[in-house]
Each structure stands twice: as C-alpha cells, then as structure tokens.
Amino acid sequence: LYSPLYSPYTYTSTTVRSYVDDFMRRAQSAGCVVYKGERADEDLSYLKEDTIWQKLKDRIYDSTITLVFISPNMREPYRKESDQWIPWEIAFSLRETTRSDRTSHSNALIFVVLPDRNGRYDYYSLMRHFTIVAGNIQNGYAEVVRWDDFIANIQRYIDKALWRKKCTPSYEVVKSV
C-alpha cells in the first residue's frame, strides 16, 4: 500500500481534508478538475442552515461529477439521515434542477473509500451506509473505489463515471434521502 498520506511504518493522523487537498493537487496538475467544494480555510459554521444549504446548492448546481470521500466517521450514528448534510448534498447533485433557461442534470457519482488511521479499508464493509449511497452502489450507478486505486488513476475513474452518467436512463438512480 502506498499513499503519500499513509506510511505502513508509522501512525499517521490524517483528515478527510488532507485527502481532498491531495486529490486537488493531483487533479489540477493533470488539468482534469475544477473544485467546487468547501475550501480548507472556509468556515460556514456562523451561518444559518438555510444559508449554508443555499451556498451548497449554488456550488452543486452546475457541477458534473460528485466525489464522495468515505471515511469511518462520515455518518453520525445517532442522528437521522435526513438530519445530516452528506445525503442531501448527494441527492441535490443527482436531481435535475432548472434555473431560468438552464437545466442541471444528474451528476456522475464516485465513492472513494479512504483508509482508516491504520491504513486499512475493511471498516467500509462493516459500516452502515446512507440509503442514497447504498442504493446507488447496488444499482451500479456509483462506483466504489479505494483511495490508493483512485489516486493512481484519477482520469480512468472519472471517465468511467461520466460514461455511466451518459447511460443514466439505464439505471434506477436513487435521488432522495
């Protein structure tokens, strides 16, 4: 296993943000991505939830691919799915939304499983997934890929996701929380 963020010889404390930053560096150097997510230095916590949601929707509206970085603690186990941000962000990215004369279509969808703090991925098969995540894995619309595989060939996984997006009518895409 090789990842610049994980060494098999030492315990490495990383965050989802560190993986996002690594992905962005690599993707931008390859010229294949424009990032529309939250910046590391961006704090929206002082805003009302409605304002945050509007900002997220504006960013998601004209995007093409939704990457979801799956980590051991991405789901808050004692909160209902409908009270968590991640399923709503995924749902909005999959819905067709019209503003003025422009319609945003379903995004391509990739789930990237991050290694845990010990560099392992086995937690993923044991975790309870959001319904929208599980549904789009089961129907084949979203691909699940380990971080080390994804980061080694970003363009391949993006191309595969875009191909599935073109074939959207062939899938029963789960679009609701």
Name each model feature, range by range.
Residues 1-65, 104, 171-176:
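Conserved N-terminal substructure of TIR/SEFIR domains
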Residues 1-6, 115-177:
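C-terminal interaction surface of TIR/SEFIR-family domains
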Residues 7-12, 81-84, 124-127:
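Short, glycine/charged-enriched secondary-structure capping and boundary segments
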Residues 65, 90-91, 107:
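Residue-level detector of short, conserved catalytic/binding motifs and their immediate flanks
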Residues 68:
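Redox-cofactor binding/interface segments in oxidoreductases and associated redox assembly factors
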Residues 72-73, 97, 103-120:
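Short beta-alpha junction loops
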Residues 73-99:
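Conserved TIR/SEFIR loop-to-helix hotspot centered on a Trp-containing motif
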Residues 97-102, 141-145:
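Short C-terminal domain-edge/linker segments immediately following a structured domain
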